[in-house]
């Protein structure tokens, strides 16, 4: 799964901009590179929790940085755990343990229960 770009600017209302073509000097068109972001997902969650609340582009950028940071921390810890146990695959068990190690108390419990729920939903939909 490709990792989103680190310095991705947040688009308004959490949507990605379409790839626009930029005119070059010799007449050929060059595609503008896409900036990956968690903005659309942050926006969807915001609307689930507070339907009447908006988010500024600066706040969206901060949320995007936060999600990237947490993703890297969990992935790094899960990688270390797999390495310690001489495993070459990161499973949901490593992710769960990494979350328990990284997040404090009640937050870890909620994250683990939500993660378990998501994995169950995914496997039942297959």
Swiss-Prot record:
Residues 1-12 have a biased composition (Low complexity). Its main location: nucleus. There is a cross-link at residue 121 (Glycyl lysine isopeptide (Lys-Gly) (interchain with G-Cter in ubiquitin)). Monoubiquitination of Lys-121 by BRE1 gives a specific tag for epigenetic transcriptional activation and is also prerequisite for histone H3 'Lys-4' and 'Lys-79' methylation. Phosphorylated on Ser-15 during apoptosis; which facilitates apoptotic chromatin condensation. One of its GO terms (cellular component) is nucleosome. Expressed by the skin granular glands. The keyword Glycoprotein applies. This is Histone H2B. The lineage of its organism: Eukaryota, Metazoa, Chordata, Craniata, Vertebrata.
